[in-house]
Amino acid sequence: MRVGGHTRVDDTGIAYTVGDYEITREMQEQIKVLFNLAIYTGLRKGELLALKWSDIDFKNDLVRVSKAVTIVDGEQVCKAPKTKTSYRTVSFPHFLANRLKALQIAELERRFQFGKDWQGEDWIFIQDNGRMMSYSTPYEALQDAIKRYNDGRKPSDQLPAIPFHGLRHTSATLLIASQQDIKTVSNRLGHAQTSTTMNIYAHALQESDRKASDVLESLLAKEA
């Protein structure tokens, strides 16, 4: 998973730069796909875990969000989203469709090997026996990947221990930094109002506004 560099603020209020890095060594393929889908769609963890293969439109490179996983009384449950705007369709790059197809084939082969012991319901992200991936797994996998990346690197070159939700924040920040309109970003995130997006990503909008100012300066300076 490669991510271009832009600055954002993590959940502790500490600013950091999303550098140009890779974290793929010794990682399960479905975890790689999970991380990529989180970055390229901005879906919440619960929305990702609730995805079934029927939610993927391979022809048009789209993912349909219609449910989410959460913890209720200590139990992992899948239910409808809290708001109408959480029901949405989000596009992703074509290379990711190919990765998803390969993962689907691998899981079908595993299902055949398990036979009657398979307990899955067509979930995309699964445990060994086909059951839905545990709610804690995405966070644990990301922390493990960050730790392995940081091993042997000096502090200034290390990645911060961001939560899994940080991938969603990174997705939005990169879109805003690339001058995507706030309505599009808000729709992809499933926010009820654009004001929610603007409040959460004020730091990225300020950076984007500064870049716009610099562009105007360079354009008008040529006319002076």
Predicted feature locations:
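Catalytic-site neighborhood detector that most strongly recognizes the C-terminal catalytic loop/helix
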Residues: V69-I71, A97, L189-V215
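Key DNA-contact positions within bacterial/archaeal DNA-binding proteins
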Residues: G46, S136, S195
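Short, polar N-cap/turn motifs at the start of nucleic acid-interacting alpha helices
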Residues: D55-L62, Q180-I200
